[in-house]
Amino acid sequence: MSEMAELSELYEESSDLQMDVMPGEGDLPQMEVGSGSRELSLRPSRNGAQPQLEEEGPMEEEEAQPMAAPEGKRSLASGPNAGEQPGQVAGADFESEDEGEEFDDWEDDYDYPEEEQLSGAGYRVSAALEEADKMFLRTREPALDGGFQMHYEKTPFDQLAFIEELFSLMVVNRLTEELGCDEIIDRE
């Protein structure tokens, strides 16, 4: 538990350090955001002092020196040391892999709803209900239009005929999809 206390102290210290430096007040030159290059812009300081011309492009020293790993430290590409397994974490403070698992236990106990396995009959029933719901949503607007015509324009509207037609379309469409009759109907 002392490791957690040390980590939280380090986090608080780094947060405090970040809060101490406000943008524009540090000694670092301002760069154009999103320019994609390392060109520094000519900007006045916040205090109203004369703008300073900053250098442009990467430093020549950076270009000349290749990136090299510090001597005495191992890189990850060098492979495991003798006696160390390829998957092991090499660290002085990390005693065992079991310590980190206590935080992951809640994932094993949680049941994700999208991972539920439905039985064949239950899946078919839910699929039929979803299809009926989609059909209802698609036909709601014409039904409202039909009701509007019935009440306001005094045109004859047979609600029973409309319901029969709607239900037959739902059933016929569903059966043709399930039985694969789409090709047969299209050929005729």
From Swiss-Prot:
Biological process according to GO: cell differentiation
Keywords (A to Z) from UniProt: Cell cycle, Cytoplasm, Differentiation, Nucleus, Repressor, Transcription, Transcription regulation
Any one GO MF term held by the record is:
transcription corepressor activity
Q: Motif range for LXCXE motif?
A: 179-183
Localization in the cell: Nucleus; Cytoplasm
Q: Give the primary localization class.
A: nucleus
Q: Name one GO cellular component term.
A: nucleoplasm
Region (Disordered), start-end ranges = 1-122
Keyword match Repressor = yes
Bias type Acidic residues, positions? 53-64, 94-117
Annotated region (Interaction with NR0B2) at: 55-121
Assembly and partners are described as: Interacts via its LXCXE motif with the entire pocket region of RB1. Interacts with EP300, NR0B2 and TRIM27.
Misc note: Inhibition of MYOD1 may be partly due to the ability of EID1 to bind and inhibit EP300 histone acetyltransferase activity.
The protein's role, per its UniProt record: Interacts with RB1 and EP300 and acts as a repressor of MYOD1 transactivation. Inhibits EP300 and CBP histone acetyltransferase activity. May be involved in coupling cell cycle exit to the transcriptional activation of genes required for cellular differentiation. May act as a candidate coinhibitory factor for NR0B2 that can be directly linked to transcription inhibitory mechanisms.
Protein name (Swiss-Prot/TrEMBL): EP300-interacting inhibitor of differentiation 1
Origin species, per record, is Pongo abelii (Sumatran orangutan)
